[in-house]
């Protein structure tokens, strides 16, 4: 009889311990709605911590077809219409030198261009080793005190020219906080 009363206690503790361990093992992930210059929701962004960077998943509709620059910006502030409130690209060094193909680059917010199909939609998963969610490996943290944003630009990034590779206006923004 005593055995039946005592056995549930260790089993309960084991289950609680396993649940806590599983919760600790889950990677840090944040999502945000992509909004257009008129404030309408165009899609969704999810950024998830990975062992050596972050995985970005993005789905969007309502954009002009073609290539668009895509960057992590330094503030989770997507005030329309121009999204200038999102600040500059995420960076750890100054002065910031832009360009994924630039051998002198130190711009941690750089990402590959996004291709939008003829129907105005795009879905993509991208991996960046330049940033982290919380500062792992000394990389800039997307979840710092003021968060960050994923910004889509009107034009493609040429990966070389300063300051933003000719990517032009900001046409969509998603806060990450």
Where are these regions (language model features)?
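Hydrophobic h-region of N-terminal signal peptides that target proteins for export
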Residues: 13-23
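N-terminal leader/targeting pre-sequences
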Residues: 21-177
């Amino acid at each position: 009889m005593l055995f039946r009363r005592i056995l549930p206690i260790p089993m309960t503790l084991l289950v609680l311990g396993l649940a806590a361990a599983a919760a600790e093992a889950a990677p840090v992930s944040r999502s945000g709605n992509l909004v257009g210059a008129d404030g309408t929701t165009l899609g969704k962004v999810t950024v998830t911590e990975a062992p050596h960077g972050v995985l970005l998943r993005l789905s969007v509709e309502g954009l002009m077809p073609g290539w668009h620059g895509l960057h992590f910006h330094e503030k989770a502030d997507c005030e329309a219409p121009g999204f200038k409130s999102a600040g500059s690209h995420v960076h750890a060094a100054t002065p910031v030198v832009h360009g994924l193909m630039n051998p002198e680059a130190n711009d941690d917010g750089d990402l590959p261009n996004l291709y939008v199909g003829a129907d105005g939609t795009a879905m993509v998963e991208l991996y960046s080793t330049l940033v982290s969610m919380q500062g792992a490996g000394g990389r800039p943290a997307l979840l710092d005190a003021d968060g960050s944003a994923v910004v889509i630009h009107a034009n493609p990034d040429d990966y070389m020219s300063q300051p933003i590779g000719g990517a032009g206006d900001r046409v969509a923004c998603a806060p990450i906080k």
